């Protein structure tokens, strides 16, 4: 029996303590019909973010993001960016570990305009973990041939030199790690300046790590790894099952 759109949304929006497997599968089957409703969920989440924070059972925005990412729905990009542009700890409050684990892949999955992601990275007061996810999403775009390495490295150089606020944060750690993923030799000097300025957490990545990659890897070897390891959001049910393995529902 085919689930109605209203029933699918009802099962997805609130956490009832079980994985809404049937609703996810039905949403995927009704991809085109349900997409406008999923976009509407994101629009409403932006307008009612405080309600989401106060309601531990609400999860509609999360399922909407994963499904729209699987659908490669580019209309979701500006909505997701707006949702994660709230300051301080709001992004973590509404998304939990999705912020650090999957936001970069979600952004890359719905991206048709790199400029929007760049704007998110450069916007003052954006949560540094959001900035980090946005930076990492550019590496993912290289990994799926939607952005050239040359373009990404050029932009990362601009972030190092003047586009990213020179304030220690996880965004800087992610920036250096992302550059290293694409091979860092061209940006060795501005990277070393960032370390000298104390912008990088050396327990996350050190200058020695950067030098080792330069000496032991190459553009080709780094690109090969990025191309083989990049994984966008392809199966929402599989993604949710992974989360369930890590964080089982409490009985």
From Swiss-Prot:
Pfam families: DUF1186. Belongs to the chlamydial CPn_0206/CT_203/TC_0475 family. This is Uncharacterized protein CT_203. The lineage of its organism: Bacteria, Pseudomonadati, Chlamydiota, Chlamydiia, Chlamydiales.
